[in-house]
Amino acid sequence: MNRIAIIDLGSNSIRFIIISVSAKGIYQLIYQEKRSIRLAEGMSDDSPFLTDAAQNRAIDCLKVYAHLAKVHQVTKTLAVATAAVRTARNGSSFLKRVHSAANIPMTIISGKQEAALGFSGVIHTIDTSEFLLFDLGGASIEISLVKNKKQLHSVSIPIGAV
């Protein structure tokens, strides 16, 4: 069995899960946690930068998650950063700090990728086949049009709850 850690670094919180995947592709949730780190705190149109304090909160949390992954004998880590890092002028340098401090390589995903991942995460939990999916995050909202359980169109708008 492989153990996979998944990290979703959002504008307001970090989600962390560990799953075990069998040879048959069946997965089991081993661990999950969500921490509010307020990464986008202090960002604005006039100051599109992640603050040092927000970066440090995120890095401290990610160090804990890296340790938990090691304790749980994780074989692969998938880590993504969303709207706050995507729009921050210092987003790339922040991810270099994350990699150096916590040894977690992260990928900045586009709004379209974020919408696709949100769709993939919920499609098997919804009984209806045609709907609009709204995924409200801290710094963006992804909206997907779904017909016949297929994502036909999606848009990411840089307006969030924070």
Model-derived features with residue positions:
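Nucleotide/phosphate-binding catalytic cleft detector across ATP-hydrolyzing
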Residues: 1-9, 17-133, 144-162
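Conserved Rossmann-like nucleotide-cofactor binding loop
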Residues: 12-14, 139
